[in-house]
């Protein structure tokens, strides 16, 4: 069936998902791969509400119960000084909160991510969010930008692109970041 073919395509990682995010600071190097494993810490609610993923160093994977391998590719597309930048992210593995946990682990949490440390816009002191203030929404700045997959019947390559949500579009306007200024797939060799 078509549904089974699509499910298999996702399971076998034959799809390509690119996310866009605004993050605190600017990573160095500007492009790279994050290979920290993830382990789940359950929340305090009756149904485990508030669960959070914690990163596990690759050397500790074998000795950390419940740890699962996780890999994220990232590329810096633009920046606003040293305070924030526009990232493209590919979850090579598809773990819960993977992108959010990985970006926080390397010191560049996603803007608006209260769970993983990216809610610093309110910091009026020396935090990354100082001087950004009310112009930037406190909502999570993570967006599933594109999905590329093979059509299950015709086998043609499909590229699906979603526009930025309103709160992120306002942020992009504030920083004068234009989606038309970057390639659809910044991970292609000729762009990097």
Q: Model-derived features: where do they sit?
A:
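RNA pseudouridine synthases
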Residues: 1-192
